Amino acid sequence: MAPKKAKRRAAAEGGSSNVFSMFDQTQIQEFKEAFTVIDQNRDGIIDKEDLRDTFAAMGRLNVKNEELDAMMKEASGPINFTVFLTMFGEKLKGADPEDVITGAFKVLDPEGKGTIKKQFLEELLITQCDRFSQEEIKNMWAAFSPDVGGNVDYKNICYVITHGDAKDQE
């Protein structure tokens, strides 16, 4: 048991404590909630199996080991919350907010179609982190109505979030 604790402590010390000054308390809490969702076995460390289970929970059951390995290699060691926050801090430094939001949606769009199923997005919004109320869901669908196939154009949502107006359809 002691070697495991020492390993975790060493991993925690590997992350920069400065990362906490990059975000306000609300943002840190949101990252903590995201970390908790991904840390499926609740051991305080995100590992390959946590990633696999998270993808499975989102309906993506055929994630290749190579994809998971590539994600794990983005960290220099075990991914505890400090390392997780540091990784996001580094990724967000100088990033365009539209690119960041689009990148978050792309995780949910493994085929790269630029759309997400309405039912899937709605389920995530009412069950994860800052849960949407039924009224908020209704308002969102009024602003961003899905197409006849039930697909939502998340690129338009990202544009409106960052620019305030709907993108002209060409």
Curated annotation (Swiss-Prot):
The keyword Phosphoprotein applies. GO terms for cellular component: myosin complex. The modification Phosphoserine is found at residues 16-17, 76. Gene3D superfamilies: EF-hand. Residues 26-61, 96-131, 132-167 form the EF-hand domain. GO terms for molecular function: calcium ion binding. The modification N,N,N-trimethylalanine is found at residue 2. The keyword Phosphoprotein applies. Keywords: Calcium, Metal-binding, Methylation, Motor protein, Muscle protein, Myosin, Phosphoprotein, Repeat. The modification Phosphothreonine is found at residues 26, 36, 102. SUPFAM superfamilies: EF-hand. Ca(2+) binds at residues 39, 41, 43, 50. PANTHER family: MYOSIN REGULATORY LIGHT CHAIN 2. This chain binds calcium. Myosin is a hexamer of 2 heavy chains and 4 light chains. This is Myosin regulatory light chain 2, skeletal muscle isoform type 1.
